[in-house]
Amino acid sequence: STITGNAEPLWVIDGVPMQKEVPTPPVSNTQIRSGDFSNIFATGIGGINPNDIESISVLKDAAAAAIYGSQAAGGVIVVTTKRGKSGPTHVNYSGTVSIQTRPVRSANLMNSREKLAWEQELWDEFAAAGYANNLQDGKSYYPVVGIVGMIRSGYGKYKGLSVAEQDARIAELGSHTTDWFEELFRTTVSTSHYLSISGGNPKMAYYLSMGYGNDQGIVLKNSYDRYNFNGKIDVTPNRVVSFGISTDFSYQTSKAPSSNVDMFKYAYFANPYERPYNDDGSYRADETYFSLSEINGSYTVALPENGFNLMREINETSAKSTSGNFTLTGNTTVNITKDLKFVGLASFSYISDHGENINGKNTYAAWMDRPFENNTTTSKRIYGSIYQTSTYNTNYMLRGHFAYGHTFNEIHRLNVLAGAQISRNYAKTIFTKRYGYDPVTGNHSTPLYPASGNNSVIDYDKLVSFGKTLDNSTGQAITENAMASFYGTIDYILLNRYVFNASVRSDGSNNFGSKEQFNATWSAGFSWNIDEESWMKGKISDVISSMTLRLATGYTGGVNKSVYPVIIMKYDNTFRISDTDSYRMGTISNAPNPHLSWEKTWDIKAGLDIGFFKDRLRLQVEAYNLSLIHISEPTRLQL
């Protein structure tokens, strides 16, 4: 439904669209790796206990999604949760215990002796002669494979070793085989508990549920906890008025290492002769995982002086995330006459997300996350970092419509609906990154930019770039979205066989230019319940229990939030200095566009649904054509 925008479907929970936008801080690197809940729990159903779900349905065409208008361009997923019913009190408990075993090292992987022998064969066949020639002319190329190639070529600390010393070192490496799958992964036990209480009478029904889940990841120091509470009360004091109130609360926490090294990839490709620890228990640097690429000239790898050790990354980095989500919803139905009623819905939600990412000063993650260009193998400067985010999101939605339904002469059924909706979302993210962080004291000391040369001169351009890095490491991001919608639908049903429907809708959004804020869409559909025909009765109905032909066409509008109707300035590293102030300069990256309008999707669809043997077997056949109109995409203009 879009090229550059968001094509994700709209999630609707008990009539409330989940569209709580989360601003993204302008910070590079994947900061909160293990559990960034912001979008998961804001736009989907991540915070709902699966045991509370009554049903899930998908609205796929324009006619079916008409009530959600512009938000439905990517489709609609409707989730209905359980509610109380008239009757005795029901208490339900369910619990699960699951065991996940760690990945097992493949029997086809070589052990240390086999790997070293293979590396020696490759050295003898492809590199030994080139190495000997290189000693003479200094220009001959020879490939280095594994630790054997490093030792035989005298790379780094192996320079000057005699052949006997080289053989002794290789033999020592072959005396131990590391199963990296056993070192990095674990067998875990995860549990979940769910308790619900429901019941009521014709005047009032209630539903309460609580849930807890704990998932232990197979990666070391990885865990996830989830708490849920759900409460609903539905009251019907008389035949005229009914109303209900529901509240949902969920809280999630996640912990994991923050290292950006793929542990599954490392476990498979790391050499078996590498060890996680020295004999004295200290971390042992991996000599081959990163270094071989540099030795063979593909690219330069910057490593800290103490080298790379994945166990250090696991133990001395952390990514923690917490999310609390509270939603309060109220609904009412007023039966004005026998055929006319008013339905209202109001919802308010609040989300609070917090993330914290810590890189210990001795880790490779901290080494690669430095505010200035001193990450070479000769630098001895080490310091940690901490990155923290807090996001606060509020959202409200008000919707009301009048619905009229009447049957004429027992063969004509007319349903008419007209309503309006307003919604607003406000989200604010505050982020800060501190270098030189000490996790013991909680303090930090921002490192000074390194001087070059004996006169302690600092290059001005690099110093300005350093200042920009520090400026961008702390700040805030704010998003605000408001919408107003007006809609109407009409359905006509003849003989309970032929169904005609049509809908119109107009949506207004602050995401567009001042001249294009409102967008009108329409849809129309027809369905034929063939199984209601007289010639479908009798023996044929024992085989074909239901058959419906569907035709639908219409438009839906979409909001592409990757483009903006307002002027945007992108700041750079240049300054303008006056007598009293210093201003950062920038360039216009987005010109104002009062004509920026909605993206539209037009679809035509035909479908046939057939149920066999009392609908025990169902067949669905569909054909459709989807067209995108008014798509926003980058275009080069000739000046």
Which residue ranges define each predicted feature?
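Outer-membrane beta-barrel proteins
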Residues: 6, 25, 32-35, 40-84, ...
